[in-house]
Amino acid sequence: EYISALVKKDVELVPISKKNISCVSSYTHTVEFGKNPILIGERINPTGKKRFKEALKNNDIDYILKEGIAQQEKGVHILDVNVGLPEIDEEKMLKTAVCELQAIINLPLQIDTSNASAMETALRRYNGKAMVNSVNGKQESMDTVFPLVKKYGGLVVALTLDESGIPQKAEDRVSIAERILDEAAKYGI
C-alpha cells in the first residue's frame, strides 16, 4: 500500500526544467553562463610563446598537458585549446591534444581554430558540449562554423568583425552581432 501511494504521488509531480540555459560541459563538469564570471585559460596557444611553438613542432604533448593541468590548478573554468601553427598538421595535433587533455583534466574545452577540418575532428572526439572559438560576421565563417556547432552541439564565441574588418563605431559592431545572431538562429543555435 505504501509503495502504491508513493507511486501515485510521484505521478502527480511535474519535473522542474530550466529553459534557455547556456552551458558547456566536459564528461564530468558543466559550466553555466550568466551567473558568475567565467575564467577561460588561454595558455594552450602558440601566439607569442616560443617554448609552446617548439613543443608543437616536436610533437611534445606533455608540454600541452602540463599547461592544462597548471591552468586547472589555478582555477580556470574552461580551457582554450589552440594548436594552430603553419609548420604542423593542425588537425592531427588538435585531435591529439583534445583526446589527451580529456584523459587527465575535467574542465570543459574551448576548441580554438579557424581550420574547419581540424574543428570538426576535435568536436567529433570531444566528450561533452564544447565551446567553439570562434565565428565572425564574415559569411564564409558563419557558413563553416555554424553547421559544425549544430551537428556536434556547443556554444560559439562570436567576434564582431566582418569582411571590412573591425568597425570603429559601436553601432556597426552591434549590427554585425545581430547579423551573426540571425544566421545562428537559422541553424537553431
Question: Where on the chain are the PLM-derived regions?
Answer:
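Domain-level signal for soluble alpha/beta catalytic cores
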Residues: 1-189
